[in-house]
Amino acid sequence: MRLLVQKVILIYLARYAKSMKEIQYYGPADVLPFARIAEFLWVYVGSALAYVVGVKFMGTVRFILFQIVNNSLRTFAWYLKEVFRLGALALITIARAFCVAHINIIIINQVFFLWEMFELKLYL
């Protein structure tokens, strides 16, 4: 199961890296390195968080199935609740990494745009 999660994440990263080559950033030339750093953080740190949470989620599902097979079904509701809780945690972690990186890119773009406008005023 862990190998399957690794393959899915690697396929996702490869597709994302290919699509990132086609994206052009609009704005001052100074923004490009910072935007690349923010994208790097989103891709690798966000995917690492998603991987860790995904592996924990799959491990919990496997543990729950083992417990259900070995024990009676009376604690099935508790196990089901744990599965949904960890699934929600995985979704929240992925969404949080996505939002933080894109908010950082927007803020960096705006800061450098304002700085360029300020420099333009100084020259005039």
UniProtKB/Swiss-Prot annotation:
<keyword id="KW-0472">Membrane</keyword>
<feature type="transmembrane region" description="Helical; Name=1">
    <location>
        <begin position="37"/>
        <end position="57"/>
    </location>
</feature>
<feature type="transmembrane region" description="Helical; Name=2">
    <location>
        <begin position="86"/>
        <end position="108"/>
    </location>
</feature>
<keyword id="KW-1133">Transmembrane helix</keyword>
<keyword id="KW-0732">Signal</keyword>
<protein>
    <recommendedName>
        <fullName>Putative uncharacterized membrane protein YMR119W-A</fullName>
    </recommendedName>
</protein>
<dbReference type="GO" id="GO:0016020">
    <property type="term" value="C:membrane"/>
</dbReference>
<feature type="signal peptide">
    <location>
        <begin position="1"/>
        <end position="19"/>
    </location>
</feature>
<keyword id="KW-0812">Transmembrane</keyword>
